[in-house]
UniProtKB/Swiss-Prot annotation:
This is Haloacid dehalogenase-like hydrolase domain-containing protein 3. It comes from the Eukaryota. Gene3D superfamilies: HAD superfamily/HAD-like (3.40.50.1000), Haloacid dehalogenase-like hydrolase (1.10.150.720). It holds the Pfam family Hydrolase. PANTHER family: HALOACID DEHALOGENASE-LIKE HYDROLASE DOMAIN-CONTAINING PROTEIN 3 (PTHR46191:SF2), PTHR46191. Belongs to the HAD-like hydrolase superfamily. SUPFAM superfamilies: HAD-like (SSF56784).
Amino acid sequence: MSLRLITWDIKDTLLRVRVPVGQQYFAEAKRQGLCMDPGSLETSFRNAYRTHSRLFPNYGLAQGMDSRQWWLDVVLQTFRLSGAEDDETVRSVAQQLYQDFSTARNWAVVPGAREALDSCKGLGLKMAVISNFDRRLEEQPMKDEPAADHMGYKRYPAASPGAGGAAVFCRSQEARSLYGPRFLGDIVP
């Protein structure tokens, strides 16, 4: 039995954050006149992210949020936990950071990703990118990075923050009309 499709997750498989989040938040805060500690921002981000993920899973979709609002709230909470008091400036920082993470400049190709994609392409394997990360990685960063060269960038229904666990793979199977025991997990115990 041959493989008919290889799916790749976007975040931390093909792309990763270029520099630690605390440093990126620090740089934007400094640019807008806030004096913050990058280490504190990193710790606060991890706490805010963990709390928000627990309270509003899948970017708050079940609670009527979109990923933009979810991320803005995480950034606002991050700065509050780090002691920022200027809400107006923090909101401006949050808006800018959301935009910045929508660009390729804040993302880096994971070492080995290009080579893995090249190898799969050389073998004639069909590939798709799926992710339950928010839709920003489907936009510009994804178009500029390795998968675009190999997969003819296309949004699949599986690339949805609402699709978690196995559902994301089932959606990719449906999108490519590949039914039956054709996935690696079906042929390798």
